[in-house]
Amino acid sequence: MRIAGVDLPSQKKLEVALTYLYGIGKTLAKEILEACQLSPDLRVRDVNDEQSMRLRQYIEQKYLIESDLKRVESMNIKRLMDIGCYRGRRHRALLPVRGQRTRSNARTRRGAKKTVAGKKLAK
């Protein structure tokens, strides 16, 4: 089954397979299946065409997923950078945005360590 350009793995249960879509986690997958009146234990390969269409239409109408969601997220970050707010400046400087410390740690955001030579002691 294919939703929003993503092939869902046929051997997985529907609840797990939906999490392969960017923007859909376990909780949202459960809600979607409940709204579409599908069993979470149903395997993707066992879903018939009618159920598949119902699921696809529900997801596309109700939620932003995959490239649409990524585009909205990147536009939100770009907007923050354009208006020059604190969060935008942190994004632009590639520093942690949510108040994490940077004196130590923050290696994920800042990249590999760049060693700076210490001061020489006078003798």
From Swiss-Prot:
Residues 99-123 are annotated as: Disordered. Residues 100-123 have a biased composition (Basic residues). Its main location: plastid. It is found in: Plastid, Chloroplast. One of its GO terms (molecular function) is structural constituent of ribosome. GO terms for biological process: translation. The keyword Ribosomal protein applies. One of its GO terms (cellular component) is cytosol. Keywords: Chloroplast, Plastid, Ribonucleoprotein, Ribosomal protein, RNA-binding, rRNA-binding. Located at the top of the head of the 30S subunit, it contacts several helices of the 16S rRNA. Belongs to the universal ribosomal protein uS13 family. Part of the 30S ribosomal subunit. This is Small ribosomal subunit protein uS13c.
